[in-house]
Amino acid sequence: MAPLKMLALVILLLGASLQHIHAARGTNVGRECCLKYFKGAIPLRKLKTWYQTSEDCSRDAIVFVTVQNKAICSDPNDKKVKKALKYLQSLERS
């Protein structure tokens, strides 16, 4: 009987953890919401692209993607972020 109770507990915990993981995602085609902003320098020459998080996310953010496919969550009101956006937009035009 004890192994059956243990199995039920494991299934319950697994189900709860999967529900938590699913709830953290936004509706932006599988892209996740940002929980906090990156505070360091933004490496302009290593940036590949960017996107804005979904309106369903609790925190408005710009996400920069580097050439190594790493995501950098950034505050859209930060001067460094605006500079990085202008840099990427100038690359798109040329």
Curated annotation (Swiss-Prot):
One of its GO terms (molecular function) is chemokine activity. SUPFAM superfamilies: Interleukin 8-like chemokines. Keywords: Chemotaxis, Cytokine, Disulfide bond, Inflammatory response, Secreted, Signal. GO terms for cellular component: extracellular space. Residues 1-23 form the signal peptide. GO terms for biological process: immune response; inflammatory response. It comes from the Eukaryota. It is found in: Secreted. Disulfide bonds join 33-57, 34-73. Belongs to the intercrine beta (chemokine CC) family. Chemokine, which displays chemotactic activity for T lymphocytes, preferentially Th2 cells, but not monocytes or granulocytes. Therefore plays an important role in a wide range of inflammatory and immunological processes. Acts by binding to CCR4 at T-cell surface. Mediates GM-CSF/CSF2-driven pain and inflammation. In the brain, required to maintain the typical, highly branched morphology of hippocampal microglia under homeostatic conditions. This is C-C motif chemokine 17.
